[in-house]
From Swiss-Prot:
Coiled-coil boundaries: none
Annotated localization: Cytoplasm
Name of the protein described by the UniProt record: N-acetyl-gamma-glutamyl-phosphate reductase
Primary role: Catalyzes the NADPH-dependent reduction of N-acetyl-5-glutamyl phosphate to yield N-acetyl-L-glutamate 5-semialdehyde.
Keywords, alphabetical: Amino-acid biosynthesis, Arginine biosynthesis, Cytoplasm, NADP, Oxidoreductase
Record EC number: 1.2.1.38
Organism from which the protein derives: Burkholderia ambifaria (strain ATCC BAA-244 / DSM 16087 / CCUG 44356 / LMG 19182 / AMMD) (Burkholderia cepacia (strain AMMD))
Catalytic residue positions: C117
Keyword Cell wall biogenesis/degradation part of the UniProt annotation: no
Catalytic activity: N-acetyl-L-glutamate 5-semialdehyde + phosphate + NADP(+) = N-acetyl-L-glutamyl 5-phosphate + NADPH + H(+)
Family according to the record: Belongs to the NAGSA dehydrogenase family. Type 2 subfamily.
Gene giving rise to this polypeptide: argC
């Protein structure tokens, strides 16, 4: 039996390079790359896409849409790491742990859209609570996140690392027009009735995200407690190898969250911090924006689509 052919369109960008690194030594697939002189040639790209079993698109949004338009072979399956198709109804959202049975949906999908880095944390925290009826659909959600500068792509990495840390701003809050491209994705896949207010920032470190969502218990259905929110998340992700929920007792000893704690992994760590006296809760997610927030998630979805036993069991 021949090995499945995987082609990465855009393997010189931040995410593409990471995916290539994760796949290059695999013996259960054939990884196809184009020579440097051909990797931007539309005709050669189209040929490589149509000759592949699974094409992984690591491109800007417009180029990703163009690449999908190249497809003439109906057998070609696609994982799109851009944000071009994340709210499209005919694409499967590539977050295996999001709802029960979703890993199998991904495994059989023709078109999978990889989640954005920030939505990975936000949807991971909010979707189970909304689905369980603990978080009303019309709750006024506010999200704050700090990412390593690699979240800005290869240009941001090159700019920061050529200037050096000594001259870098320690924190850059951006998206001040409150129109970040991830907002519609978060709203849709978290099941929210209204746009969340999202404030992102880049820190002066390469990779890793801390994302937080404050919750006022008085705005939730009567009787919902911080303990109930935690129990919901713990139950939802029980058995998920790539998502862990910090035991509630352990959060009382945590004084800070390190955005780099899970760098190099494909893991997502969720925590619930409770101030029962004042009726306030802080939901928090820590993960690698280049791991579970990008390349790691793409490889996890690829493994599901290829039927890799360990991936199916883990999800």
């Amino acid at each position: 039996m021949s090995l499945p052919i995987v082609y990465i369109d855009g393997d010189q960008g931040t995410t593409g390079l990471q995916i290539h690194e994760r796949l290059r030594d695999r013996t259960d697939l054939r990884l196809v790359t184009l020579p440097d002189a051909e990797r931007k040639d539309p005709a050669r790209r189209a040929e490589a896409i149509n000759a592949s079993d699974i094409a992984i698109l690591c491109l800007p949004d417009a180029a990703a849409r163009e690449a999908v338009g190249f497809i003439r072979n109906p057998a070609v399956r696609v994982i799109d790491a851009s944000s071009a198709h994340r709210t499209e109804p005919d694409w499967v959202y590539g977050f295996p742990e999001m709802v029960d049975g979703h890993a199998q949906t991904i495994a059989h999908a023709r078109r999978v859209t990889n989640p954005g880095c920030y939505p990975t944390g936000a949807v991971g925290l909010l979707r189970p609570l909304q689905q369980a009826g603990l978080l009303p659909r019309d709750y006024p959600v506010c999200i704050h996140a700090v990412s390593g500068y690699s979240g800005g792509g290869r240009a941001a990495v090159d700019a920061f690392e050529s200037n050096g840390a000594a001259r870098a701003q320690p924190l850059q809050v951006y998206g001040l027009a409150l129109a970040h491209k991830h907002v519609p994705e978060i709203q849709l896949h978290a099941g929210l009735a209204h746009r969340p207010l999202f404030v992102p920032a880049y820190g002066a470190y390469r990779q890793g995200i801390v994302l937080t969502v404050p919750i006022e218990l008085r705005l939730l259905p009567a009787g919902v407690t911080g303990e109930a929110l935690h129990a919901c998340l713990a139950h939802h992700y029980a058995g998920a190898r790539r998502v862990e929920v910090t035991p509630l007792a352990d959060t009382r000893a945590i004084t800070h969250l390190d955005p780099q704690a899970l760098n190099g992994s494909n893991d997502l760590r969720l925590s619930v911090f409770v101030n029962a006296e004042h009726g306030q809760v802080l939901l928090a997610a820590v993960f690698d924006n280049l791991g579970k927030g990008a390349s790691g998630a793409a490889v996890q979805n690829l493994d599901l689509m290829l039927g890799v036993a360990s991936a199916v069991k883990a999800a």
